[in-house]
Amino acid sequence: MNFYAPQMTGVIADNLRLDDQEATIRAINKVIPAVVSIIITEQVTTTVINLNTGQQTEQKSKVRKGSGTGIIISPDGLILTNKHVVNVAGEKTAEYRIILNSGRQYYAQFIGKDPINDLAVLKIFDKNLPFVQLGDSDKLQIGATVIAIGNALGRYQNSATKGIVSGLGRNIEASDQSGNTSETLDNVIQTDANINLGNSGGPLVDLDGNIVGINVATDQTGSSIGFAIPINDAKPVIKSVREIGRIVRSRLGVRYHMLTPELASQLKIGLNSGAWISINNDGTPSVLDGSPADKAGLKPGDIVMEINGIKLQDKTTLLSVIQKYKPGAKIGLRVFRDGKIIILTTVLDEFR
């Protein structure tokens, strides 16, 4: 009797590799027409003094401030990118030049920045523009293949890198290149697909060519550790712009850390999930004065376990649950304080 299983295994493996390659190419080709390069310039005024006459004149010029990547999310030109991409220049003095993969160029209007996440929205004015399909980041699993696309290093337009989802629900402290500005990002996707400088604001794509994340940061102390904002966390921003014309976010008004086994051990509590309201020794308030959290009676050291019956844990962070509700919504909080469970209520206001 002859056995051909090893040969068949090789054929199957070759076919799987070919299928994976074809799927990757299809996904990239589907998305790239809607991936744009963003060039930010700012108009500056310089005072020139004539040494002979002492006369002063003002000269205006444009200075390039930075670049990044964005994605067109609607046929009428809404563009999603990172807040830190547009933050390099003032909103009133900046110009945003948009370059499509086809070579077409536009100047974009600034729509708004997300006050709680590293997201911003621009708009170009045209019809029938190429746009991406939004996926469902809640369905992502560790090990899933993903592709990061962006304007790498500000020079290599629409570069694509491939990897897998390495982790979900990560909480990171992200800073700009200067290190002067930092922001805590909750619930981000970790991937080993290289996210190079300039890729910020570009899409993280699954093999069906659907956007599952917005590339946002890389850990420069490690190798192949990149992060993306889940597209489902961006959907409220998109919905708000479409319905209201600006970005509206709800606010509770606390600074917190999601519980981890390490933090729970440090705090010497028996809980394994929830949002711990920070106890800050630097004078920074963890419950903002006059905020809905303040009015509810939340205190530093409290652990918010549930909001309206939704348990706070890895994928349902305090921030993500709050964003399910509009400003003015009444919410109930199940809180652990001094070994006891208490129930508090409050009304959310708008994050400004």
Map each language-model feature to its residues.
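Conserved PDZ fold ligand-binding element
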Residues: I79-L80, G290-K315
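A general beta-strand register signal
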Residues: I99-L100, D206, K299, E306, ...
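Flexible, small-residue-rich helix->loop connector segments that border functional cores
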Residues: A27, G301-V304, L333
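Acidic- and glycine-rich mobile interface elements
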Residues: F125-N128, W276-S286, M305-N308
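PDZ domains, with a preference for the canonical peptide-binding region formed by the helix
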Residues: N87-K92, E306-R334
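Serine-dependent protease modules
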Residues: N2-Q266, L271-S273, I279, L319, ...
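PDZ peptide-recognition modules
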Residues: V254, S286-V287, G301, D314-K315, ...
